[in-house]
């Protein structure tokens, strides 16, 4: 099980996977953000889910919603994690 707030170096790839969650407008979102090590930009392999009840996560597939969430998560988490990786 991958815990929230994890940074995982993907083997044989120049990427990290960051897992975390955030509450936006009362909805809990979970992410698995795959980030290129060199450019520090999230890749298309990133996945987002929203929690609709205590036991159910739904994948987010709408491109506009994905772009919105990438922006939130990048602004909120990416710099923090990249600083942690560099230390």
What are these regions (language model features)?
Residues 3, 19-60:
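Basic, polyanion-binding surface patches
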């Amino acid at each position: 099980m991958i815990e929230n707030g994890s940074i995982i170096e993907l083997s044989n790839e120049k990427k990290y996977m960051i897992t975390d969650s955030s509450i936006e407008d009362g909805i809990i979102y979970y992410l698995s953000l795959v980030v290129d090590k060199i450019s520090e930009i999230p890749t298309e392999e990133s996945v987002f889910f929203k929690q609709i009840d205590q036991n159910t996560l739904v994948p987010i597939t709408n491109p506009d919603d994905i772009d919105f969430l990438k922006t939130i998560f990048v602004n909120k988490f990416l710099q923090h994690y990249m600083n942690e990786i560099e230390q």
